[in-house]
Amino acid sequence: MKYVFEMLDEVKSTKKIEDKIQVLQSYNSIWALKDVLRGTYDTSLEWDLPKGAPPFEANQGFNAPANLLQEHKQFKYLVIGEASKNLPKLRREMLYIKLLESIHPKDAEVVINMTSQKNITGVSKTVVQKAFPNLIPT
C-alpha cells in the first residue's frame, strides 16, 4: 500500500483534470487520503491547533512506527468538535506532535499543510469535489 504523500504525488504528476479525477477515484476506499483532502479544503472544519509546524522530531521514514493510513483516525481530536471538546489544549497538541513523529516525514508534511489548510499543489479543491462529490460542501 502506498503512503498518502505518494498518492498525492501520483495525482500531481498527471496533467489533465480528467486524469487527476480518475487517479483520486482509484483511491476511493482510502479514507486517510479523503480525510486529508477534506481537512485541507473543507472550510467548515476548524483545526484547534497553533498555525504552522510544531516542534517535532521527524523519524527517518524507513523506520516510521506508524502509518497515516491508520493514524488519520486521530484527526477528530484535532478539530473543534464533539470528540475534542473535553480534551485539554496541551494534550491535543501533544497528540498532534506524537502523530507527526510516528508517521513518514513526507506524510507529516502533508498533515501540517492540511492543518494549516494550505492548498495542495497540483490537486485543486475543484478536482477533489469532482472526484468525491459528497466529501466537501460547495
Model-derived features: where do they sit?
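N-terminal nucleic-acid-engaging modules of covalent nucleotidyltransferase systems
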Residues: 1-138
